[in-house]
Amino acid sequence: MATVKKKLDAGQFNLKDQVVAINRVTKVVKGGKNLSFAALVVVGDPSAAVVGYGSGKAKEVPQAIRKGIESAKKNLVKVNLSQTSIPHQVLGRYGSGRVMLKPAPEGTGVIAGGAVRAVMTSAGVQNVLTKSIGTTNPHNVIKATFEALKQLRDRREVAAGRGKTVEEL
């Protein structure tokens, strides 16, 4: 049976936004070309380990970014952290994209590129090793990263699932 996660309220967090990609799109019509912009935005509160992503489309770049931020605030995810890193290694898949997240010792930093780095820093992860495999499309890379983050379980959740205490693990 699937568990229902409660929706996180964006108002209770100090969210910082980060633009991952801006795409200029042209639609050819009878009278010429219509220009518009699409923005991919990641928002997060590093102190609360909350992160979300969204995309916005508009005729101007600032409006597209604003719409992306509003969209990102609607799908926030709580990230399970173990001190400054992630608790265990995970592999997120979306489309042809694969993103591997691996815990790292203190002082390593965020070893990630592009879209994955934006998600990790926004989520408050300070030490992690990542590898993005397959697609370079930032939309699919971010979605694969979020699939990986949703798989993270801390020691208490694992112990509860096995019917044991944390000390028994």
From Swiss-Prot:
Q: Which domain of life is it from?
A: Bacteria
Q: One GO CC term of this entry?
A: small ribosomal subunit
The record's SUPFAM superfamilies line, in alphabetical order, gives:
dsRNA-binding domain-like, Ribosomal protein S5 domain 2-like
The S5 DRBM domain covers 15-79
InterPro entries of this UniProt entry? Ribosomal_Su5_D2-typ_SF, Ribosomal_uS5, Ribosomal_uS5_bac-type, Ribosomal_uS5_C, Ribosomal_uS5_N, Ribsml_uS5_D2-typ_fold_subgr
Per its UniProt record, what PROSITE patterns does this chain match? Answer: S5_DSRBD
Keyword Protein biosynthesis (UniProt): no
State the Gene Ontology BP annotations: translation
Q: Which residues form a coiled coil?
A: none
Keywords for this entry? Ribonucleoprotein, Ribosomal protein, RNA-binding, rRNA-binding
Q: Name one GO molecular function term.
A: rRNA binding
Q: Name one Pfam family in it.
A: Ribosomal_S5
Per UniProt, subunit arrangement is: Part of the 30S ribosomal subunit. Contacts proteins S4 and S8.
Looking up HAMAP family in the UniProt record yields: Ribosomal_uS5_B
Q: Which family does it belong to?
A: Belongs to the universal ribosomal protein uS5 family.
How does the entry describe the domains?
A: The N-terminal domain interacts with the head of the 30S subunit; the C-terminal domain interacts with the body and contacts protein S4. The interaction surface between S4 and S5 is involved in control of translational fidelity.
Give a short account of what the protein does.
With S4 and S12 plays an important role in translational accuracy.
The protein's name: Small ribosomal subunit protein uS5
Tell me what organism the protein belongs to.
Koribacter versatilis (strain Ellin345)
What is the primary gene name for this protein? rpsE
